[in-house]
């Protein structure tokens, strides 16, 4: 497809929107980019240098602009006026993911990882497995670097491992991963999707354009993901911590075993040998193993990476030990399910820092889990009162409502004793106080390391 002279409207100027606008302008398209919010002057100047026409503080009228194509950013709800009007006029609406897919060099094989929790860890692990096996592989997508920004690094015939979100999958029209994995589905982003059913349907779209020779990897222990197998046109592999599925990965006396339907059972390693700890990371490791085996990675090489892969930043990331207290950064825990997995990954007494902006979640189950695990609960941000109510109903009395994030970290440190863990796992989004979960995690690490320096 020739982009020269094509009129493209980019709606939303977050990371992926800016990357899409820049790439399209370089390809010769006439790009108009808009956002309701203001942008930093440096970002504006970079876009202007590429010839992008900017509209800030609102949206242009699609009927007047008459673009050939609309690119939507993940943070823009699908019902926003320019997107709805474009669809009504028959103008294609793509996500940045769809755009990047269409711009890939020939022969590239795509692995797509989605799910409510574990996406980034599993995506990073899959990429590392391929790279350590000597395969040309690029990791990107929702993991932090928009895929369209990495196109120059992707060679013909190579591999792309991308983390994909429900928001990105809403606006795909041909995105075709040779291997797609849905790790788990629990209520999340319901403020955006409107219902759990809509959220599940968005996640399932990762398999929408697969073919019979492709692979879909699903969590057998999760009823939502397991139920999606019937709609898959590709070969389905399951992973399970509890029982042996028809085909896929399971545990046998603690050893990870895999059967893809040809070649018999492959035994990898004991789950205690995995570098990533916690039951949720066992699931992530099993999913990554199936991805690798489906692509043809040597089992011995795969096992070596499973045993040595380091922790991913902001996912149960050890920060420091101060006076016998271990500090853990789990800023990526942006929903109750993620935080429940985090607090159950350790047996030590926990001081938990939680709170932020609720994404439509119910905190009841989380509070019940905290009641048996958390010795002191420090709450901060917009959802602090809502979390406090759920916690008190669950019988938790040791609660502190912090006026700001730094106060929350100081309170948690003061409440901890040698042998305890202070964990940031907010169960909420970061947007009430920070740009993103990465910034929140970085601030937490900075505050902890400052305490260590102060002695």
UniProtKB/Swiss-Prot annotation:
One of its GO terms (molecular function) is ATP binding. It catalyses: UDP-N-acetyl-alpha-D-muramoyl-L-alanine + D-glutamate + ATP = UDP-N-acetyl-alpha-D-muramoyl-L-alanyl-D-glutamate + ADP + phosphate + H(+). It is found in: Cytoplasm. ATP binds at residues 115-121. It comes from the Bacteria. It is an enzyme of class 6 (ligase). GO terms for cellular component: cytoplasm. Keywords: ATP-binding, Cell cycle, Cell division, Cell shape, Cell wall biogenesis/degradation, Cytoplasm, Ligase, Nucleotide-binding, Peptidoglycan synthesis. Pathway: Cell wall biogenesis; peptidoglycan biosynthesis. One of its GO terms (biological process) is cell wall organization. Its EC number is 6.3.2.9. SUPFAM superfamilies: MurCD N-terminal domain (SSF51984), MurD-like peptide ligases, catalytic domain (SSF53623), MurD-like peptide ligases, peptide-binding domain (SSF53244). It holds the Pfam family AlaDh_PNT_C. NCBIfam families: murD. Cell wall formation. Catalyzes the addition of glutamate to the nucleotide precursor UDP-N-acetylmuramoyl-L-alanine (UMA). Belongs to the MurCDEF family. This is UDP-N-acetylmuramoylalanine--D-glutamate ligase.
């Amino acid at each position: 497809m020739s982009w020269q002279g094509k009129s493209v409207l980019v709606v939303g100027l977050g990371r992926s929107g800016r990357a899409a606008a820049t790439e399209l302008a370089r390809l010769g398209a006439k790009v108009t980019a808009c956002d309701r919010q203001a942008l930093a002057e440096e970002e504006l100047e970079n876009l202007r240098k590429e010839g992008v026409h900017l509209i800030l503080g609102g949206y242009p009228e699609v009927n007047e602009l008459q673009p050939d194509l609309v690119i939507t950013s993940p943070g823009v709800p699908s019902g926003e006026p320019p997107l709805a009007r474009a669809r009504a006029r028959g103008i294609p609406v793509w996500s940045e993911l769809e755009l990047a897919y269409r711009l890939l060099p020939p022969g590239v094989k795509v692995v797509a990882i989605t799910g409510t929790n574990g996406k980034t860890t599993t995506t990073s692990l899959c990429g590392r497995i391929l790279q350590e096996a000597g395969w040309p592989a690029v990791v990107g997508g929702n993991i932090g670097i928009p895929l369209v920004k990495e196109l120059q690094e992707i060679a013909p015939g190579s591999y792309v491992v991308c983390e994909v979100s429900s928001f990105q999958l809403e606006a795909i029209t041909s995105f075709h991963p040779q291997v797609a994995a849905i790790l788990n589905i629990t209520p999340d982003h319901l403020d955006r999707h409107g219902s759990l059913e809509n959220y599940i349907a968005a996640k399932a779209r990762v398999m929408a354009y697969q073919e019979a020779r492709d692979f879909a990897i699903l969590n057998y222990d999760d009823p939502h993901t397991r139920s999606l197998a019937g709609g898959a046109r590709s070969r389905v592999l399951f992973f399970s911590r509890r029982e042996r599925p028809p085909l896929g990965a399971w545990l046998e006396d603690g050893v990870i075993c895999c059967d893809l339907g040809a070649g018999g059972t492959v035994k990898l390693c004991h789950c205690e040998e995995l570098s990533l700890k916690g039951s949720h990371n066992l699931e992530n490791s099993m999913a990554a193993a199936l991805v690798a085996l489906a692509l043809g990675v040597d089992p011995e090489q795969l096992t070596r990476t499973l045993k040595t892969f380091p922790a991913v930043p902001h996912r149960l990331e050890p920060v420091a030990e101060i006076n016998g207290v271990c500090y853990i950064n789990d800023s990526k825990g942006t929903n109750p399910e993620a935080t429940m997995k985090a607090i159950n990954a350790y047996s030590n007494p926990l001081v938990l820092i939680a709170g932020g902006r609720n994404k439509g979640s119910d905190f009841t189950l989380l509070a019940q889990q905290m009641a048996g695990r958390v010795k002191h609960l420090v709450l901060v941000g917009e959802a602090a009162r809502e979390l406090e109510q759920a916690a008190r109903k669950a019988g938790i009395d040791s609660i502190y409502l912090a006026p700001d994030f730094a106060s929350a970290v100081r309170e948690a440190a003061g409440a901890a004793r040698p042998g305890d863990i202070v964990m940031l796992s907010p169960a909420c989004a970061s947007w009430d106080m920070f740009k993103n979960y990465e910034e929140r995690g970085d601030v937490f690490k900075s505050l902890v390391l400052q305490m260590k320096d102060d002695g």
